[in-house]
From Swiss-Prot:
Phylogenetic classification of the source organism: Bacteria, Bacillati, Bacillota, Bacilli, Lactobacillales
Top-rank taxon: Bacteria
EC number: 5.4.2.10
SUPFAM superfamilies named among the record's database cross-references: Phosphoglucomutase, C-terminal domain (SSF55957), Phosphoglucomutase, first 3 domains (SSF53738)
Name used for this protein in its record: Phosphoglucosamine mutase
PANTHER family associated with the record: PHOSPHOGLUCOMUTASE (ALPHA-D-GLUCOSE-1,6-BISPHOSPHATE-DEPENDENT) (PTHR42946:SF1), PHOSPHOHEXOSE MUTASE (PTHR42946)
Binding site for Mg(2+): S101, D241, D243, D245
Active site: S101
Native species: Ligilactobacillus salivarius (strain UCC118)
Catalytic activity: alpha-D-glucosamine 1-phosphate = D-glucosamine 6-phosphate
Single GO MF descriptor: phosphoglucosamine mutase activity
InterPro entries according to UniProt: A-D-PHexomutase_a/b/a-I, A-D-PHexomutase_a/b/a-I/II/III, A-D-PHexomutase_a/b/a-II, A-D-PHexomutase_a/b/a-III, A-D-PHexomutase_C, A-D-PHexomutase_C_sf, A-D-PHexomutase_CS, Alpha-D-phosphohexomutase_SF
HAMAP family for this protein: GlmM_B
Length: 450
């Protein structure tokens, strides 16, 4: 597809993602989503993160929606999972989030949720693409009766935090938490959430100015929170990303606890209480071998998917699992929400710490992360590279040397002409040797001479 990637439509604000395109997306997307709407007129929720281009794109998108007769409810600044939850709560026909998640400030994106709170299917996205690509706009253009209306729905934020508070059985009194809001969508919500739950908390990166979202902070820069946790003497730290769908934690010593470890800690806790469906956690191929070893030792099963939270959610829905996610901090608790939810993940983790009385460092120590190295190689043909006999031989040779105590993953990039060679092994030295052994063969066989 030309416009839609794995996470909606993305681009550089005011360039590849222009207000003109946002207007068209409002018209075409709104029209497709409301063909089968249960409400007449159709109702759509719209929200954005804190980046400066959000307001420009939001106004254009809303104009497009109104022009095809849609009743629009504006949430203002809200998290992506907040939109997914509120669409279901309000019985809306769709939700639209304007955000480029953890990307830098110049990027932005527009992603759609169906009435069930799940990201759109490929089929729906293809329908929207077809209308966007069409030479002429044949969609309705009412002049008076039949135009849409716009209402504020700022109380949605309170409803969302109240819902989050009900996902854990106890308050957080007696806990000292450090919070990094990435200067993004969670900035205005976290203080209310932790204050309501009685926690003692310190916040950083919760003053968005439109330009500082994700800038050296948040889940993609957890070292900032690690320093802050030690400085404040907190027992745990949680960092979110720009649109609040990721969470990375930090223990009391300033050590980073990634999505793999968070999934394990929460999954094991639920399993011991008979609440982890099929005793299974859904992971992606990028999860560390240390996670799988820890799961095996605790009689937990795993199901692997391609990289991307949408594939994790697909597998969870298809086979009835309730916990899954990615190393990057997208963790999905399907009992509560339909997508990765950073604040929800933080609460589940904090609840385990409180209920078990253990330190986060103790809980995370069960997953012994193996050193990992990733090399990207520019190739002439990424698909042919995977079928190349000499490359296959090199991979088999390395796997033989590992003898089950490590792993290799060779996969093409989804967006560029790159082959990604990743290995995990007991020591950094070993992992480097293994990666280079395969990378050298890839270079010799299919490399681009620059």
């Amino acid at each position: 597809m030309k416009y839609f990637g794995t996470d909606g439509v993305r681009g550089i604000a005011n360039e590849t993602l222009s207000p003109e395109l946002a207007f068209k997306l409002g018209r075409c997307g709104g029209y497709v989503l409301t063909q089968h709407a249960s409400n007449k007129p159709a109702r759509v929720l719209v929200a954005r993160d804190t980046r400066i281009s959000g307001q420009m794109l939001e106004q254009a998108l809303i104009a497009g929606l109104l022009s095809v007769g849609i009743e629009v409810f504006s949430l203002g600044v809200m998290t992506t999972p907040g939109v997914a939850y509120l669409v279901r709560l309000q019985d809306a026909d769709a939700g639209i989030m304007i955000s480029a998640s953890h990307n830098p400030v110049q990027d932005n994106g527009i992603k759609f949720f169906g009435s069930d709170g799940y990201k759109l299917s490929d089929e729906k996205e293809e329908e929207i693409e077809a209308l966007l690509e069409s030479d002429e706009d044949t969609l309705p253009r009412p002049s008076a009766e039949g135009l849409g209306t716009l209402s504020d729905y700022r109380e949605g934020a309170l409803k969302y935090t109240q819902f989050l508070e009900q996902t854990i059985p106890d308050d957080l009194e007696g806990m000292h938490i450090a919070v990094d809001g990435a200067n993004g969508s969670t900035s205005a919500l976290v203080s209310r959430l932790f204050a309501d739950l009685g926690a003692d908390f310190d916040t950083m990166a919760t003053n968005p100015d439109g330009l500082n979202i994700n800038k050296g902070v948040g889940s993609t820069h957890p070292e900032a929170l690690a320093k802050f946790v030690v400085e404040k003497g907190a027992q745990v730290g949680v960092a979110f990303d720009g649109d609040g769908d990721r969470c990375i934690a930090v223990d009391e010593n300033g050590e980073i606890v990634d999505g793999d470890k968070i999934m394990f800690i929460c999954g094991k806790y639920l399993s011991e209480r008979g609440r982890l469906k099929k005793d299974t956690i859904v992971t992606t191929v990028m999860s560390n071998i240390g996670l799988y070893k820890a799961m095996k030792e605790n009689n937990l099963n795993s199901v692997q998917t391609k990289v991307g939270d949408r594939y994790v959610v697909e597998a969870m829905r298809k086979d009835g699992y309730n916990v899954g996610g990615e190393q990057s901090g997208h963790v999905v608790f399907l009992d509560f929400n339909t997508t990765g939810d950073g604040m929800l993940t933080a609460l589940q983790l904090l609840n385990v710490i409180k209920q078990t009385g253990k330190k986060l460092s103790e809980l995370a120590a069960e997953v012994k992360t193996y050193p990992q190295e990733l090399v990207n190689i520019k190739v002439t043909d990424k698909k042919a590279a995977l079928d190349n006999e000499k490359i296959k031989e090199a991979i088999a040779k390395v796997e033989e040397k590992m003898a089950g105590d490590g792993r290799v993953l060779v996969r093409p990039s989804g967006t560029e002409d790159l082959l990604r060679v990743m290995a995990e092994a007991k020591t950094q030295e070993l992992v480097h040797d293994y990666v280079m052994e395969i990378a050298d063969v890839v270079e010799a066989e299919m490399g681009v001479n620059e």
